[in-house]
Regions:
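A flexible loop/linker signature enriched in serine peptidases of the S9 family
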Residues: 53-54, 72-78, 92-97, 110-124, ...
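Bacterial N-terminal signal peptides
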Residues: 13-25
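Beta-strand-rich domains and repeat architectures in extracellular enzymes and scaffolds
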Residues: 44-78
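Beta-strand-rich domain onsets/edges
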Residues: 334-351, 359-360
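Catalytic cores of extracellular degradative/oxidative enzymes
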Residues: 451-637, 641-648
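Short coil/turn segments that connect the beta-strands within blades of beta-propeller domains
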Residues: 65-67, 105-107, 150-152, 211-213, ...
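C-terminal functional module detector
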Residues: 358-377, 385-386, 395-401, 410, ...
Length: 723
């Protein structure tokens, strides 16, 4: 398209035109997960709720005989023989199953069933007959079911009746409830909103003491930071009124206490009050006392469970990246991996083997796969880093070929590779005990690199305390699968923890893991909740510390220093800086509270920030951006989705990104950030808009000798989906 118009003189006219047009071509793909929950939000979904897409073990629970452990895997519950590694599939059918727990007599198995990231229900299976009974069937969330020591009751978490997380006990007999629920806890308002946790208290992860008279649970009642302390609570109606705190520390949903067979101690997962980067296992007296550290990983240990004889602790480790079933010898300390050597399915299965080729050279190419089998569920290869996007899509990346075992019948899958290749969708009829071989060729929409444009998300995190353990190599792999030219990883805090600080290298240049066709930069997200979060890339000497200000109840609660102070310190080291995800929604933040980027306009005026980032398709950021542009300030709009790839639920890497024109300078950190500072950038969540005014490019200044002039504006929009 070509049009001619008369315009007033404008500073960097093309920046505004190109960004504005590209932005409104994006698709606003949003969906509310678990709408019945009125508290918790994204962090609770990622750190606490059962992971739907996991192809590897999660949520271990011992069988009463101590010979096997039930786990959640591939959307079903499996029983794994500890000695042989043989896994028997116990459940199948609708929903994604997790959080298993056996009745003391071994006759019943209770578990959760997740339906399309909207609701989570309780079901129970008769182990002898395989018959399944629905304990709940509504629009609420039910979690953490656990049988009482006598098998006559089940304690669980529910969002009934008001959408907040409370603990209930209910009598159970022969596959069904036999009495109304007893509310051990109830809704309680902290009195004001807490950072990331809101005003309403949560009560989660109950576990019984051996005599059945009390529960240990986790609650943030009267706690300003974190998901809560461990409380000892009578297993009666309103037992929370008699609660005693037995462990007080800042936590993040991972504690999950489990009481020993003698009732004297409990094992739990902890970062030691956020002192450590990773979760390890600890034990402590059930009446309170000092913790004792049991593991010393440079990765995470989650979900510990005592064996029936107390001699071993089953847990989930992620030292190899994916979750694995692990065993800790209680007295002796030996740690072993319970390798799953054989899968025995309930339903007939077949294998699908796929190769994905790049049409440019007919070579294997990394990509992303969305897959649905004949039972309506997602499946992934057993070695895949499977995850859920923030809208609920279940995906895995692969290096250009994969094999996956799925139920017989029609399977459909889609293959995608960033914004510059057309997606492909294929269907196949899977046949029992056969291998179906397929080849998919991805056709290119456009090659922006050949046109001098190179892309990256400006907001990527490798690790953030998630179920998975991420590495720069894996981050690079996923970025290649998404067609990104640069990987801009950010070190960041989560509460008092600092994640990935060991990845930072001084010098101000590209990371040593960079390759000729893929640049890696390790920067920092500085995250004060009041002034707004910012990125800092290219620091020559050290990370900026403290990583946050204004955290209630900590030594950095003060609002000093300001963002201006810290941004200028980063710039003194050569950093490029920008405000990240600062303005959400559609309302002008300049007319209200200034949104999440309260320091942006001031820092733009003071030259402390270079960029303003978009991480979703909201429009509120246009108001402050055009305000600074109209004031003659050279601020560049950037795109970065804030993906956190160690979380099982997070935005997918590269789903919002920045294209920067480097021209003949090619692909390098220096050329890319130099182009960004010059405003030669566009933001997109998919559609690619090329635009020019005459021979001028984004970032150029167009001046007229008189009050009016004529400009030729040309542009072309390309998109892999309809816009």
């Amino acid at each position: 398209m070509v049009s001619t118009t008369s315009l007033q003189p404008a500073l960097r006219l093309l920046v505004g035109l190109l960004f504005f047009s590209t932005w409104f071509a994006t698709a606003d793909v949003t969906a509310q997960a678990y709408p019945s929950a009125r508290s918790g939000g994204n962090y609770m979904h990622a750190f606490y709720l059962p992971p739907a897409p996991t192809a590897t073990p999660w949520a271990p629970a011992w069988a009463p005989d101590g010979q096997s452990v039930a786990v959640s895997m591939q959307g079903s519950i499996w029983e794994v023989e500890v000695e042989t590694g043989v896994a028997l599939q116990l459940t199948s059918g609708r929903g994604y199953h997790s959080s298993p727990n056996f009745s003391p007599d071994g006759r019943w198995l209770v578990y959760t069933s997740d339906f399309d990231n909207k609701r989570i229900q309780l079901e129970v299976m008769n182990i002898e007959t395989g018959e399944v009974f629905r304990l709940t069937d509504d629009d609420q969330i039910y979690l953490d079911p656990v049988f009482s020591p006598d098998g006559k009751q089940i304690a669980y978490v529910s969002t009934q009746p008001s959408g907040y997380f409370n603990i209930y006990i209910r009598n159970f007999f022969d596959g069904s409830w036999v009495a109304p629920p007893v509310a051990v806890t109830s809704d309680n308002d902290f009195g004001r909103s807490r950072l990331y946790f809101g005003a309403w208290d949560m009560h989660i992860t109950p576990t019984w003491v051996p005599d059945g008279s009390e529960l240990l649970l986790v609650s943030n009642r009267d706690v300003p930071l974190g998901s809560g302390n461990v409380l000892r609570v009578p297993a009666i109606e309103n037992g929370i009124e008699f609660a005693e705190t037995v462990l007080s520390e800042q936590s993040l949903y991972r504690t999950r206490p489990d009481v020993s067979i003698d009732g004297k101690r409990f094992v739990y997962s902890s970062t030691s009050g956020s002192a450590d980067q990773y979760n390890n296992l600890y034990v402590q007296p059930t009446v309170g006392g000092e913790p004792y550290k049991m593991t010393f990983f440079e990765s995470d240990a989650f979900h510990p469970r005592w064996s029936p004889d107390g001699e071993n602790i089953a847990f989930i480790g992620n030292s190899e990246g994916l979750s694995r079933l692990m065993m800790l010898e209680t007295y002796g300390g030996k740690i072993t991996h319970v390798s799953i050597n054989e899968l025995r399915h309930r339903e007939p299965m077949g294998m699908v083997s796929v190769k994905i080729l790049n049409s440019d050279d007919n070579q294997l190419t990394p990509n992303r796969v969305h897959l649905k089998a004949s039972d309506g569920k997602f499946y992934a290869p057993l070695d895949a880093y499977a995850r859920a996007g923030h809208v609920g899509d279940l995906v895995f990346h692969n290096d250009g070929e994969f094999e996956v075992q799925v139920p017989v019948g029609d399977m459909e899958f889609s293959v995608l590779k960033g914004f510059e290749f057309h997606p492909m969708t294929k269907s196949v009829n899977v046949i029992e005990n056969e291998v179906i071989h397929l080849e998919v060729k991805l056709e290119r929409l456009i090659n922006m690199g050949k046109r001098g444009w190179h892309n990256a998300s400006t907001h990527v995190h490798a690790n953030y305390g998630g179920n998975l353990h991420n590495t720069l190599d894996n981050l690079k792999f996923m970025s290649r699968a998404e067609g990104q030219d640069l990987v801009l990883e950010q070190v960041a805090n989560k509460d008092n923890r600092i994640l990935d600080y060991h990845l930072f290298e001084g010098g101000g240049g590209a990371h040593s893991s960079s390759e000729e066709d893929q640049v890696v930069v390790v920067g920092q997200e500085y995250r004060p909740p009041f002034y707004g979060h910012v990125f800092m890339f290219g620091m020559k000497d050290h990370l900026i510390s403290p990583f946050v200000t204004g955290y209630e109840g900590t030594a950095v609660e003060s609002l000093y220093p300001s963002n201006t102070d810290m941004l200028l310190k980063a710039k003194a080291q050569g950093a490029v800086t920008g405000y990240v995800h600062p303005f959400l929604g559609e309302i002008d933040p300049l007319e209200g509270s200034l949104g999440g980027g309260k320091g942006f306009v001031v820092d733009a005026a003071l030259g402390a920030t270079d960029a303003l980032e978009w991480s979703d398709a909201s429009t509120s950021g246009f108001y402050p951006l055009y305000a600074v542009w109209n004031s003659g300030l050279r601020i560049t709009a950037t795109g970065g989705e804030d993906s956190i790839s160690s979380l099982h639920r997070s935005k997918l890497i590269g789903s919002f990104r920045t294209y920067v024109y480097t021209g003949s300078a090619g692909l390098s950190m220096e050329a890319w950030f130099d182009g960004l500072l010059k405003g030669r950038a566009l933001v997109t969540s998919g559609p690619i808009l090329e635009m020019a005014v005459g021979s001028s490019l984004p970032g150029d200044t167009i001046e007229f000798s008189d009050d009016r002039g004529t400009l030729n504006i040309s542009g072309r929009l390309r998109s892999i989906v309809d816009v």
